[in-house]
Amino acid sequence: ERTGKSVHLIYMSPQGKTLTQKRVKELANIDNIAILCGHYEGIDERVIEEIVDEEISVGDYVLTGGELPALILADSISRMIPGVLRNDEAFTLESHYNSLLEYPQYTRPYDWRGKTVPEVLISGHHENIEKWRRERSLERTFLRRPDMLSGAELSKKDIEFLQGLREKTSDELKNESNM
């Protein structure tokens, strides 16, 4: 208030709404944010009632204070600000940004403990590489965090791919139950 600028005050609290990538994107558009952290027992309820704009939680577990959640919040918001990352489009491909988990990453060497980098990734065929990445992203999300798919923008091809995964998974489960 002293500067005359409006400040959005966030209190890091296990009682707040769970932080999501959607909320991070929204917060990245707010010019002035201050983060309030409690320690052990939290902060005075009157402060929350009178000056806190929003309570945010980073998950359902106990920490000694709000400092680590505040760092998580600050880091996730800063990644959305143009110029923070070397490639401003890089964050759009990462897990959670578009309600999908990120595709698998591979580095050198080509062969590590008998496991090789998928051939499509070294083929140089960019269209096939993009298709592979999209399908692996869909597959990972389907297998590990299917709850996220409801928020994803899916093309007709994506839906067909996921239907194929459902059928494959259903068939595998049937085969296992017959053993």
Model-derived regions, located:
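S-adenosyl-L-methionine/SAH cofactor-binding core of RNA-modifying enzymes
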Residues: 1-39, 82
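Short gly/pro-enriched beta-turn/loop segments at secondary-structure junctions
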Residues: 4-5, 29-30, 51, 56, ...
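Fold-independent oxyanion-binding glycine-rich loops
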Residues: 12-15, 37-40, 59, 66, ...
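Glycine-rich, flexible loop/turn motifs
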Residues: 15, 23, 43, 52, ...
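Short glycine/serine/threonine-biased micro-segments
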Residues: 36, 40, 57, 81, ...
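Structured adenosyl-cofactor binding patch, chiefly the S-adenosyl-L-methionine
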Residues: 43, 47-96
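Long, charged alpha-helical interface segments
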Residues: 96-151
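C-terminal accessory regions appended to core domains
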Residues: 129, 133-179
